Amino acid sequence: MEIKENTANEEKRSISFVEQLVEEDLAEGKNGGRIQTRFPPEPNGYLHIGHAKAICMDFGVAEKYKGICNLRFDDTNPSKENNEYVENILNDIHWLGFEWGDIYYASDYFQKLWDFAVWLIKNGHAYVDEQTAEQIAEQKGTPTTAGTASPYRDRPIDESLQLFEQMNTPEAIEGSMVLRAKLDMANPNMHFRDPIIYRIIQTPHHRTGTKWHCYPMYDFAHGQSDYFEGVTHSICTLEFVPHRPLYDKFVDFLKEYDGTAEQGLNDCRPRQIEFNRLNLTYTVMSKRKLHTLVDEKLVNGWDDPRMPTLCGMRRRGYSPESVKNFIRSIGYTKFDALNDVALLEAAVRDDLNKKAIRVSAVLDPVKLVITNYPEGQTEMMEAVNNPEDETAGTHEISFSKELWIERADFMEDAPKKFFRMSPGKEVRLKNAYIVMCTGCTKDADGNIVEIQAEYDPESKSGMQGSDRKVKGTLHWVNANDCVKAEVREYDRLFFVENPAADERDFHELLNPESLQVRTNCYVEPFAASMQPGQYLQFQRTGYFMADPDSNSATPVFNKTVGLKDTWAKQNKK
């Protein structure tokens, strides 16, 4: 007997494992049914698309479950942080379309963290170690062998308190002392083997100036900041899985410190949940390597359109919706994977197809003369802005005797399946007339410098004569009414699929042809008037956006992505 389930009234749902865990906590009434997340960037660089995945999760969970997502800058290392990064992080989150609740800084809690560290020392849970970094590392042991206790591990509490105070003075020498948590040197989790929780840094802080000379380590500040703010779900990437026991241990200490441990260690505390990072083919996400690319001028700054940074993608012409759609499509799992950058580009194409204005631009021009078109005459043709969006309207493009077309759209001796322009064949000039090629002119070196054709006056778009079947349709611009432009075409920054896993120096993996600049391009005036932030499709070529380097004399355009995936074709060969 076959049993059929009646699912007609069931809501079809597809949620991530993170959302499942959040829903379990809500069902159990944890944290009073309250949801609070946070996005905690360190202001030591620009956000990249990997951060966008975390942003979508942090803000998405809060929005879905009617909670709040705050923004917290983990600014515990003044030697690498500044306000430039803070401002750009704010801009990038806004660009993605998210709104935070409150803005916090780990530096807001420096005094509270200091007081907590003093409490740890007084209760025998921390000590000042005067060994070198190398000595401490040697004593850590291995995952299968216990570590060796520091000779300072059992120093008197009063002595550690006095030295800890000395660490926070202008005279303290960086590296001379650290504060370590006194945990378990035999724990198989290496992070538990008396981790360093404070170190001396004499660089002025971008917010607190020279008030502090001793700063908390990330593992000491992060969970405590979550706890201070009332975060319910601390969502992070998989590399923090081994850090979770330490995160929980410090929260346990905090609950003892503030007197809430008696109410239950599991009450009102943040829960750390880890998901897989976003890794892309032909891309590096390492902040260190991205810094190197910028510092060594291997790219033109953090917003170079070849960079995986959000500001670079924005400048290149990616839409925030395409980035978010891509992230939704790859999902969140417990396993790291390498995602094909072609999937991101497909998401960009799909979104820009719906919103990009179609314009005419010729990147490799050759002159086309319509020999039977009246001398000195100009006509205005109507061009649809976006066939996918009726509300986008139209604009006018001028037509005259002399035009520019793409050099690749002409062949003097064309094969049978070449449906573009060649002698004796008809093609349609988009939004204009059907023309027949009658010949071409070459220079002394045999290069084609001009193409001739005749037009059919009855074949104008919209007229009855335009209905006849012509296989080829070409784009063009009026040679007497166009604007010379610069076009920057971008390719993969690295020529190997997984540069992060390649053992060679990553400098050797850079694609020398990742940027091609064309300076002899022509665009219609309507295209030249476009500003950065307006999405364009150069017909039959790809998606583009005006660059901030544009000026009234020479507009500059960045190629966002081609109409088709050219790399897929290359890989099939």
Give residue ranges: language-model regions.
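Active-site cores that bind ATP or allylic diphosphates and position pyrophosphate for catalysis
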Residues: 71, 75-77, 105, 119-290, ...
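Substrate/cofactor-recognition hotspot
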Residues: 295, 326-573
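N-terminal catalytic cores of NTP/NDP-binding nucleotidyl/phosphoryl-transfer enzymes
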Residues: 11-90, 206-237
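Long, charged, mostly alpha-helical binding arms that flank functional sites
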Residues: 263, 267-347
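Residue-level signal for inorganic ion chemistry
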Residues: 29, 58, 89, 120, ...
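Conserved short loop/turn motifs at secondary-structure junctions
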Residues: 40-43, 72-80, 102-111, 134, ...
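Basic/polar N-terminal segments that are highly enriched at the extreme N-terminus
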Residues: 1-13, 572-573
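A glycine-rich helix N-cap at a beta->alpha junction
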Residues: 85-111, 116-119, 124-127
